[in-house]
């Protein structure tokens, strides 16, 4: 197994029968969905309720035969297992390069435990060192957000999809990918400023949310717990 698969498999020990499980989005989360589906088919896990974090994870769960439920049906998940684009030593995260940050955060904040699975390359000493920060904005007046994001020290770039068309999220919004020279030194302040601005729907800063990170490498999987 590759490091992502190893991390995904390690997360299975936190899942037991009758759990409501938040189903993450992305390549690493997909390995978890495969492992979860195999355990369900083998009868090792029973009465699992999968809560998808995107249309992508919803489609994948249907393909794999994972029973799906909405947040209205499962307002509190026992656990969510998801990937991350960056993992800081204190388990603060950047997520959202796959475009599902809003739904991922909604499901995560309605979960008793958020378990992050990633490979060693996603571990950073400071958020923003490698990955841009995705910021989801309403389509109405989205052009006006660029100046505000620059005022926070970011170098924003509007995300475009295939054919050069503006990328649109599952929720009908746009995304600015924001690079910060030297990384994000004041993540809490940046998050607070973003939350105050009308038209900014959500950011990929997941601060104080993860309980455990399982980091896969060629040498195995190491577990990091929030202190």
Model-predicted regions and their roles:
Residues 2-5, 55-227:
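Conserved phosphate- and dinucleotide-binding cores of soluble alpha/beta proteins
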Residues 1-82:
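N-terminal active-site beta-alpha-beta segment that forms phosphate/nucleotide-binding
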